[in-house]
Amino acid sequence: VEDILRIYGYNNVEIPTTLKSSLTTKGEVDYSQKLQNLISEQLVGCGFNEILNNSLTRAGYYDGMETYPSKNLVMLLNPLSTDLNAMRQTLLFGGLESISHNANRKNADLKFFEFGNCYYFDAEKKNPEKSLAAYTENYHLGLWVTGKKVSNSWAHADEESSVYELKAYVENIFLRLGLNMRNLVVGNLVDDIYATALSVQTKGGKRLATFGIVTVSYTHLRAHETRH
């Protein structure tokens, strides 16, 4: 526009006697983005690296899963390959792919985080009048910690990462968002994804977070699939 005005001539443009403007206010999207930036800055300050994985994933990852049954996958009608034939239900496998990619290149001490949408299909909610009634999209944050917490330091002995370290990161996120852990309920979680795990819920029963040690069957599955 500036180049056009230069050619046309600023003096040839009539300026009205009144100027019109509209006031804008911050909406829900702006507030959500602000919170995301706040959490991202905190995690980066703790040594995390942000990752961004494809929302398309391999449906085979969900075979036999109880937490995320394959029947609830949003399947693609014409997938390019079996590696990208469904929409992800969880951020878990994308993070494991990133870990496997780095571990295969001798980089095993990792701390990752990712913000992303997950997708869910419920056949019971199908409605001929509402084509999208059976589909749900939710925004999630995933954290992955693996390898050594401290390595090759002259001031500190090598120390392996642990679930307690991850628990501290999760609690610090809640504190940064103004949530008092005393008002939340932390309890044991039985889940086929984790060998041992905890969940964080409100007193009303709404689950806010789950974290734990991923079972060997899923970590081995990811490594095997990556090699092939």
Predicted ranges, named:
Residues 223-228:
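A short, hydrophobic C-terminal helix/tail in secreted or cell-surface proteins
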Residues 2-222:
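Extended beta-strand-rich architecture
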